[in-house]
């Protein structure tokens, strides 16, 4: 009789666990996205797409102003856009002079033709190129191509931005960006090297 009770108890546990299996689909989300639509709304970028996995319940995510809704087999993501100008800081500031009246830098090879009273040696804080446009925030772990220009509002600002251009609107780029966002919520287990 006790053995029958134990089997019944374990059977009920197993039945309950079977109902929990769909929850595992959430961990697969970062690798299951496909962008299907992009809408530039001026102050935000709206991205819609499909998931290759069926979610048992909707979920809403927010991180650093980015908002995402995942529901059944679809997702919607809203990325806030920051208007420029923003600054791209040059690393080799010793090769430049700063023109305070124009708020810009020029290479020392060209600065030799500028009146000395109108220039000063560039510092890390003054050695930047300004760029107008609209920019979207990068998440800390997001990897961009080495050639990408990463902009900031000021030298002290640790938050980096990328110019919203055709490259940033490409499907492959957006899917990589969304995957990085989702990995904050659904971290992947390290793969077994063996």
Where are these regions (language model features)?
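DEDD superfamily 3′-5′ metal-dependent exonuclease/proofreading module
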Residues: 1-194
């Amino acid at each position: 009789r006790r053995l029958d009770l134990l089997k019944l108890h374990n059977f009920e546990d197993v039945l309950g666990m079977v109902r929990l299996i769909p929850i595992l689909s959430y961990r697969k989300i970062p690798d299951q996205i496909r962008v299907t639509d992009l809408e530039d709304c001026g102050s935000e970028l709206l991205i819609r797409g499909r998931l290759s996995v069926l979610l048992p319940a909707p979920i809403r995510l927010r991180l650093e102003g980015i908002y995402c809704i995942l529901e059944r087999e679809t997702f919607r993501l809203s990325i806030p856009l920051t208007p420029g100008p923003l600054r791209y800081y040059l690393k080799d500031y010793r090769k430049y002079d700063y023109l305070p009246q124009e708020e810009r830098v020029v290479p020392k090879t060209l600065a030799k033709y500028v009146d000395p009273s109108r220039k000063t040696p560039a510092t890390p804080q003054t050695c930047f190129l300004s760029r107008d446009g609209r920019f979207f925030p990068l998440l800390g772990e997001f990897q961009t191509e080495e050639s990408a220009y990463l902009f900031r509002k000021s030298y002290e600002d640790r938050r980096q931005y990328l110019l919203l251009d055709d490259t940033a609107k490409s499907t492959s780029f957006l899917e990589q960006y969304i995957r990085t966002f989702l990995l904050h919520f659904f971290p992947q287990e390290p793969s077994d090297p063996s």
